[in-house]
Design a protein with these regions (language model features):
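Hydrophobic alpha-helical segments
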Residues: 1-165
Length: 165
């Protein structure tokens, strides 16, 4: 799958084994790209995992919105691995639903995507519409940061994927 050797969950020892257990406890499994990141830089992977756990328990952002956001970005950025992985996550976590039904969550997703892909047209009016729906500037910032981090990580995954000859 990757052009470098990774330490699989079943082969991990010590600190890495503990990290994998924490990830598995939270997600139910250890994604292959987490094994990739942890095999290269365990400290960075710990920070990445903690950040993801924090976002999954965000007070105002529905954790079920996250895989939809990642999938939409992966499609727009042509990230094959992330499209496949997040399609599976959406199917598993959401049981086939399109999006969380809360209107403020849909608006938040829309505005984060607009801020990333239509930056020149993103204005204070967009932030005001979020505020009117109960989403603070901090909540928007948190999801925008998450999305930006995902864009970087998805690119790193593509770099390390085995390419077909």
């Amino acid at each position: 799958m990757f052009i470098v050797d990774v330490i699989k969950k079943e082969d991990a020892t010590g600190e890495l084994k503990s990290l994998y257990k924490m990830i598995e406890h939270s997600l139910g499994f250890v994604p292959p790209h987490f094994e990739l990141f942890a095999s290269i830089d365990i400290e960075a992977m710990k920070e990445f995992a903690q950040y993801n756990f924090k976002m999954m328990s965000h007070a105002k952002i529905d954790k079920n919105l996250l895989p939809f956001l990642r999938l939409e970005i992966a499609k727009r950025e042509c990230r094959s691995y992330c499209i496949s992985f997040n399609t599976q996550m959406v199917t598993k976590l959401m049981d086939g639903e399109k999006l969380p039904s809360d209107a403020s969550q849909k608006l938040l997703l829309e505005k984060v995507l607009k801020s990333l892909y239509e930056t020149k047209t993103f204005t204070k009016d967009d932030l005001n519409s979020l505020e009117k729906s109960g989403i603070s500037n901090r909540d928007f910032y948190d999801l925008l940061s998450y999305a930006s981090n995902f864009m970087a990580k998805s690119k790193m995954i593509e770099v390390y994927l085995k390419k077909e000859a």
